[in-house]
Structures are given as structure tokens and as C-alpha cells.
Amino acid sequence: MIGSVRGSVLERLASGEVPLSDAGPEPLVAVCTHGRHDRCCADNGRPVARHLRRAGVDAWECSHVGGDRFAANVVSFPHGLFHGRVTPASALPLVHAYADGRIHPAGFRGRAAWPPAVQQAEILLRHELGEWGVEALTLTSHE
């Protein structure tokens, strides 16, 4: 049964009948609400996720993303931008900035794809330059 369903879905994807993604141009944000790992993630994250959804933002509750001490933590996709200490009041400005191609500086913790030292370097450089465009800086290499 599972094999036939899986085969059917794969055939439909390959034929183009079903798109691989229906993601639109609007950002998708994940809010850590993992209360079993650390209660503050649920206590601080759930109100943020609820506020964003009520405002029409595609906001998902997710499991642990690291940095409990920064709860509520938000990850903005597709760029994988981490923000910490997000509140319901600060959540919408963060999402609106991201939708406009900018990184909201308050609580910015770096990019998921980069190691912690590179994340810190990006944060310091952005503050120094005052440059907050998502695509404004390019990482060419790191050690």
C-alpha cells in the first residue's frame, strides 16, 4: 500500500501534475515552540507564532533551533536567518523587513548555513557597515 502511494506521488511529481513546491513569494518563518527542551521556548515562542499567523504570516511552530536563552527564536526562510528575543510586538517588523529584502537588525543571530564564528563576523560587519540587505554581503570562504 505505502509503496503504491509513494509511486503514485512520485509519478505525479515527475509528470509536472503536482508542483514540487507551492511556496509563494511571501516569507515562511519557523518559531521554536519546543517546550520539552526548554519551557521558555514554548512560553515565548507560541505567542509569537500565534501573533504572526493572526497577521496572515506563514508561521510554523517548530522543534528546537538552538539558543534557548534567546527565546523566542525565529528562522526566516528561504535564507535561514536566525533572530532571537523576538516578541509579538517585534515579530511583524522582522517579517516585513525580510519580505522587503532586508534583515531586521534587532535580535539578528546569523544564518543557519554558516558556522557560529562566521555568523558573528556577519553580525559585526553588518553593524559596522550599517548594511542590512539580505543579499548585500557575500561569503567567499571561511576557515
Regions found by a protein language model. Name each.
Residues 1-143:
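Histidine/cysteine-enriched polar flanking segments
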